[in-house]
Each structure stands twice: as structure tokens, then as C-alpha cells.
Amino acid sequence: MAKVPIAFLKFVIVLILFIAMSGMIEACIGNGGRCNENVGPPYCCSGFCLRQPNQGYGVCRNR
């Protein structure tokens, strides 16, 4: 069995983590989109969902 260099294994691990994180980043709601902080993913890209007390949904905004 051939030996695999450690540097190559590190590269593969970083590549897998990068691909996984890029999928999570794309799965967010942009500013101005409808959101619901009680439901779960997808979340606002900004991390903030502004919901008025009389509405069932919120709007993604910057803090």
C-alpha cells in the first residue's frame, strides 16, 4: 500500500471543510428577505431577523 504524504491529507481535510462551509454560507437569506427566527434554517446572512410583534414573519436586516 502506498504512503500518502501528510501534506496531501491536510490539504484534503481543508478542502472538505471549505466545501462544507461554502454550502452553509449559500443557504442563508439576504437582507430584505422574509425570515422566521422560531423555525430554524435558513437563517439571515446578517444573523439578525427583525420581527414586529403583530407579524408572523420578520425581515432580515443588519443590526
Curated annotation (Swiss-Prot):
It comes from the Eukaryota. Possesses antifungal activity and is also active on two tested Gram-positive bacteria but is non-toxic for Gram-negative bacteria and cultured human cells. Homodimer. InterPro entries: Antimicrobial_C6_CS (IPR013006), Gurmarin/antifun_pep (IPR009101), Gurmarin/antimicrobial_peptd (IPR024206). This is Antimicrobial peptide 2. The gene is AMP2. One of its GO terms (cellular component) is extracellular region. It comes from Mirabilis jalapa (Garden four-o'clock). Disulfide bonds join 28-45, 35-49, 44-60.
